[in-house]
Amino acid sequence: MPNRTLLIAGNWKMNNDVAEAAKLADELAQALPEVPAGVEVLVCPPTIDITTVHDRIQPAPIALGAQNVYWEAKGAFTGESSCDMLKSAGCTYCIIGHSERRDYFHETDEDQNKKAKALVAAGLVPVFCCGESLEVREAGTYVEHVVNQVKAGLAGLEITCPKQVVVAYEPIWAIGTGKTATAEDAQEVCGAIRETLKEMFGEELANGIRVLYGGSAKPGNIAELVAKPDVDGALVGGASLKAADFASMVVKAGE
C-alpha cells in the first residue's frame, strides 16, 4: 500500500456560534499542539466561524476547511461564498457533496462537479462526499451507486498531484445515527472507490488519493477503520465537536 498521510477531518456542520467556536478552537489547539507523524488534521467550521477559528487555532498544526462553496468567482449569488473568499479566510480544504447538501438543498452530481473543478482551479482541496441510503444498501446496489457518484462528481477533474482531492465515503444510514459500517464494509466501498479513481486518473495518482470513511466515526472505532488498506482517515461529525474526543481520534489513528 502506498504511504498515504492519514486525514482526520472534523465537520462541525451547523453547530457553534462565534464564542463557542472560539472556545472549541482554543481547546483543540491546546489538545493538539502537535500531531502524530503520518497524520493530518482538518476542521471545517460553519462559514461564520472560519475567521475566528483560523485566528484561534494557530499555531497548532490543524488545517482549516469550509463546508460549502459556490463555483462562480463573484456576483449576484446571495448567501454563497467563492473559492477565493474561502482562501482569503485561511481555508485550504472544502467539503462538497455531503448527503445533507444533496438531500436538503437538492444539490446534484453536476453541482458537485462544478464545485470540484472550481476548488482545484483555485488551489483548494475538495473533500468529495459520496454514499448510499439504507434503501440502496439493502437493495445490494450500493457499490454501483457510490461509484457512479464518484464518476459524475469528479468527471473531467484535472489534477497532477494526489493531494489535490480527497474522497469521503459516508453511508447515509450511518451519519448521526450511532450505526457504523464495519471496517470490512468501509474497506469494500473505499476499495471500489480506489479502483474507480484508477480508471479516471491512472494508477499512480489514484494510489495516492486519500479515501476517508465517515458515518459515526469515533475514538472507539478509528484504529480499526484506518487499519484497512484503502481507508485513509475519517470525516468526523459529532465527535469533532468535543476536543477531547477529536484529539483522541487523531492520536489513535497515528498509533
Each PLM stretch: what is its role?
Residues M1-E255:
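Active-site loop-to-helix "anion-binding N-cap" substructures in soluble metabolic enzymes
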